[in-house]
Structure formats: structure tokens, C-alpha cells
């Protein structure tokens, strides 16, 4: 996640440009709604509110500290900014609840939203709070929860998961070559004393990963910490649930944007957007079958990256991959709330 407290968010102007395609589209309502699904410190939301003075921005975040900071930062916009604490795949519940509270116009149910941004992964604000346990450079409790009220911590994973479960997490979520070896070391060391703080884990990783790999593969803790964070916060599950759910809220012409920082996230986004933007007409037919046309089209050619100039100013922009798409057909658009079977 790109938000840097006190600094310009990654690719801010490009995000405004992409979301603006939906806000300014001919199908946008007079009071368009933008969802900033990963609010952080509020930098992208602030850019949207400044750029589109007729729009309402809904900021979602599971981290109450982020919500408090963003609410203070964006108070000057009054009722044009509303926030809600949730995992980002809870967007439908959030929008419904905000409409019930009168903080969003009820017409959003019918018209949908004009754009959204999801800036995935851990925020710079969270990395800069060592007590949260996200950063391996500072000794801190092995927590890693984006929502401090969630039950699962990184320490619990290390102390209670089986060897096979730990190895799977490190391999799948961290692409760690030495996942099995690290898992064996964790199980062996936790029998002596449970894991509590990050420094001990970092020390174990230095001792376990061969020196040659440490010299060429970046910091030895990077992949393990990433994998633990993804497991603690169920990040990939949330993302997989999110994409079809948020897509149903887009009106024709509205634009959705995802910013990814890990290949796992980007692969999930890429696969989903390709499926959404592909016609259901069987290949080989000379015409598009009615009702089988693609609901969406891609608005970026592949994955866009930050410019060299921006990366030079902000190294955290280096890994970002941006993918955007827009609705071109009302075929799959849903009016919420969904009917529930009796």
C-alpha cells in the first residue's frame, strides 16, 4: 500500500486521472461516489476530494488508527467524506450501512458508484509504527494485525501452526525457497521458548537461509514477514472476494483501479479483470451473441508502473503495478441489497 504519512501517495495524479474517467462519464450522477477501499492516512482520498468538488468519497479501512488519522486530515471536507471500518471485501455492507445512516444518498443503490481505488498490502503508516510488528528492521511484538481486534497474530502462527502449515504459508505467500528449512527451525526453536518478538525471528532467518542467497535475494526476512502478514490478515482471500463484489457496484463508464505490490496480488487482479473483460460468446462465431458481451473493458495496457522520477523520490513506488477497468455493459450490474433466498 502506497500511502506515506506526510508525503505524496504513489502515482497520485495518475489515480486521479483514472478515477476521473468514471466521475466525469456521461452516466455519472450529479453527486458521484468514489470508494477509497484502502484509506490509510487519506492521501488518495484527499486528492479525489480536491480534484472532484462535487463528489463524495467513502474511505474504508480495517485499521482504527488509520481511520482516526484520516478523519482528522479530511475533516475540512465535511460530509463529502465518510469513513467506515471493515475489511475491503465488506464494501457492500459498508455502503448499505452508510445509506441507512443517511451518510450516503439512497440513490447509490440504483445508480452505483463512479469509481474506486484499492491500494493493496501494508500501508507505509503501518510500517512506520514499529509496535505493529510489520517491519523487520526494528524489534517489535510479532503482531502484524491490520485490525488490532482480530484474533490471529504472527506469533500465534509461529507458535501453533504445524510444520507443514508454516512451510505452505511461506512458500505460497512469500515465494520462499527455503520454506521447509525455515519451518523446521521455527518448530525446533519454539519448543525452547515461544516466539514473541521480531528480532528473534530475524536472527533465526539469518541463521537458516544460506549466505549466498542472503547476498542476492534481498533481506532474508522480507519474504517470511510478507507471508505471515498475508496469513494474519487473510489478504488474498479478501482480494478474491472483493473483485466480483465491488465490480457489481460500478455504473456504465465507472472506473475501478487496483494498485498491487506483490506478484501474488497482481496475478489475482490480472486474472479477474481478464475474465470480466472477456466476451462469453463461444470463440469462432461471426457475431456477438445477445447477452454474452463483455461487461467490462481494460483501461490500462498491462500493468502500469511508477515513473523513474517518482521512484527516485520515493523508493516505495518501485514495485507498484496498476490495473484499471471500466463497466461498458449493464448486463451484470446488481441493484443492492441482493435478494436473499427464503
Curated annotation (Swiss-Prot):
Task: Show the GO cellular component annotation of the record.
Answer: cytoplasm
Which species? Corynebacterium jeikeium (strain K411)
Name listed for the protein in its UniProt record: Ribosomal RNA small subunit methyltransferase H
* SUPFAM superfamilies membership: Putative methyltransferase TM0872, insert domain (SSF81799), S-adenosyl-L-methionine-dependent methyltransferases (SSF53335)
* Broad enzyme group: transferase
Key word Lipoprotein present in the record? no
Which reactions appear under catalytic activity for this entry?
A: cytidine(1402) in 16S rRNA + S-adenosyl-L-methionine = N(4)-methylcytidine(1402) in 16S rRNA + S-adenosyl-L-homocysteine + H(+)
UniProt lineage: Bacteria, Bacillati, Actinomycetota, Actinomycetes, Mycobacteriales
Q: Which domain of life is it from?
A: Bacteria
- What is one Gene Ontology biological process annotated in the Swiss-Prot or TrEMBL record? rRNA base methylation
Can you say where in the cell this protein is located?
Cytoplasm
Q: Which GO-annotated molecular functions does the record name?
A: rRNA (cytosine-N4-)-methyltransferase activity
Question: What InterPro entries does this protein map onto?
Answer: RsmH, SAM-dep_MeTrfase_MraW_recog, SAM-dependent_MTases_sf
Q: What does this protein do?
A: Specifically methylates the N4 position of cytidine in position 1402 (C1402) of 16S rRNA.
Q: Per the annotation, which location comes first and is thus the protein's main one?
A: cytoplasm
Indicate yes or no for the key word Iron: no
UniProt keyword annotations, A-Z: Cytoplasm, Methyltransferase, rRNA processing, S-adenosyl-L-methionine, Transferase
Enzyme Commission number, as recorded:
2.1.1.199
Q: Which NCBIfam families match?
A: 16S rRNA (cytosine(1402)-N(4))-methyltransferase RsmH
Amino acid at each position: 500500500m502506497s500511502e506515506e504519512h506526510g508525503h505524496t501517495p504513489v502515482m497520485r495524479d495518475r489515480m486521479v486521472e483514472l478515477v476521473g474517467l468514471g466521475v466525469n462519464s456521461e452516466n455519472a450522477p450529479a453527486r458521484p461516489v468514489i470508494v477509497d477501499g484502502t484509506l490509510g492516512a487519506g492521501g488518495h482520498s484527499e486528492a479525489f476530494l480536491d480534484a472532484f468538488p462535487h463528489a463524495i468519497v467513502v474511505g474504508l479501512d480495517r485499521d482504527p488508527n488509520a481511520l482516526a488519522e484520516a478523519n482528522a486530515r479530511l475533516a475540512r471536507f465535511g460530509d463529502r467524506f465518510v469513513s467506515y471500518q471493515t475489511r475491503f471485501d465488506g464494501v457492500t455492507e459498508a455502503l448499505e450501512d452508510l445509506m441507512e445512516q443517511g451518510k450516503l444518498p439512497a440513490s447509490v443503490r440504483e445508480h452505483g458508484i463512479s469509481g474506486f481505488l484499492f491500494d493493496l498490502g501494508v500501508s507505509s503508516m503501518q510500517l512506520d509504527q514499529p509496535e505493529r510488528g510489520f517491519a523487520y528492521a526494528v524489534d517489535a511484538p510479532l503482531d502484524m494485525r491490520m485490525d488490532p481486534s482480530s484474533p490471529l497474530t504472527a506469533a500465534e502462527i509461529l507458535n501453533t501452526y504445524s510444520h507443514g502449515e508454516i512451510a505452505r504459508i511461506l512458500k505460497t505467500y512469500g515465494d520462499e525457497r527455503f520454506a521447509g528449512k525455515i519451518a523446521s527451525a521455527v518448530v525446533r526453536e519454539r519448543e525452547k521458548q515461544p516466539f514473541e518478538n521480531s528480532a528473534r525471528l530475524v536472527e533465526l532467518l539469518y541463521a537458516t537461509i544460506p549466505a549466498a542467497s542472503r547476498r542476492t535475494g534481498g533481506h532474508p526476512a522480507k519474504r517470511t514477514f510478507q507471508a505471515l502478514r498475508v496469513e494474519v490478515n487473510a489478504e488474498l482471500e479478501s482480494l478474491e472476494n472483493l473483485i466480483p463484489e465491488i465490480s457489481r457496484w460500478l455504473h456504465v463508464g465507472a472506473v475501478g483501479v487496483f494498485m498491487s505490490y506483490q506478484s501474488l496480488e497482481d496475478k489475482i487482479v490480472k486474472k479477474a479483470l481478464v475474465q470480466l473483460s472477456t466476451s462469453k460468446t463461444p470463440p469462432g462465431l461471426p457475431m456477438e451473441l445477445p447477452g454474452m458481451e463483455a461487461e467490462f473493458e481494460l483501461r490500462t495496457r498491462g500493468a502500469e508502473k511508477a515513473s523513474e522520477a517518482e521512484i527516485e523520490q520515493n523508493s516505495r513506488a518501485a514495485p507498484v503495478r496498476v490495473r484499471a477497468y471500466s463497466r461498458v455493459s449493464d448486463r451484470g450490474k446488481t441493484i443492492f441489497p441482493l435478494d436473499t433466498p427464503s
